[in-house]
Swiss-Prot record:
Protein name: Peptidyl-prolyl cis-trans isomerase D, mitochondrial
GO biological process: protein folding
Its EC number(s): 5.2.1.8
One GO CC annotation: mitochondrion
InterPro entries: Cyclophilin-like_dom_sf (IPR029000), Cyclophilin-type_PPIase (IPR024936), Cyclophilin-type_PPIase_CS (IPR020892), Cyclophilin-type_PPIase_dom (IPR002130)
GO molecular-function term, one example from the UniProt record: peptidyl-prolyl cis-trans isomerase activity
């Protein structure tokens, strides 16, 4: 550790009308400061409206892709389908580094290839070494992994979308 205090942020998640609980993440702002700051600011909503015309905020967005024994993915607050999202730096930003390797419970950037990070993220629910070197790990679940598992176990359609929406009803910094 470099003496930098790692930020902690939270999601309050519900499935349909049922509250699931709180997930707390510790962000690796000492290793990937730009990536961690993007996620932190999208949790607080402090950057206002983005270039898309939508608030730069995860609040109200859903987990649009859930694959059992792999990961849960969210962060598309512009479309809600997995085709959108936007970073606090503009539509996308470059990969910062791949120093941290994927493990169960890590928080990592979803992307469409090299240097295409936006707001979409995923939380791993299984060992995923095949993702190393292609997705930036920028944090980990430190509380509420049981809530992540509830999202992972949601009934999904053929497109891996939960049939009862799993929504981030609140989020912020601790």
């Amino acid at each position: 550790m470099t003496g930098i205090i790692r930020n902690k942020v939270f999601f309050q998640i519900k499935q349909g009308n049922t509250p699931l609980g709180r997930v707390v993440f510790e962000l690796y702002n000492d290793i990937v400061p730009k990536t961690a700051e993007n996620f932190r600011a999208l949790c607080t909503g402090e950057k206002g409206i983005g270039k898309s015309g939508k608030p730069l905020h995860y609040k109200g967005s859903s987990f649009h892709r859930v694959i059992k024994n792999f990961m849960v993915q969210g962060g598309d607050f512009t479309h809600g389908t997995g085709i959108g999202g936007e970073s606090i730096y503009g539509r996308t930003f470059n990969d910062e580094n791949f120093l941290v390797k994927h493990k169960i419970g890590c928080l990592s950037m979803a992307n469409a290839g090299k240097n295409t990070n936006g707001s979409q993220f995923f939380i791993t629910t299984a060992e995923t070494p095949h993702l190393n070197g292609g997705h930036t790990v920028f944090g980990e679940v430190v509380e509420g992994f049981d809530i992540v598992k509830k999202v992972e176990n949601a009934e999904t359609d053929r497109s891996d979308r939960p049939k009862a929406a799993c929504v981030i009803e609140d989020c912020g910094q601790l």
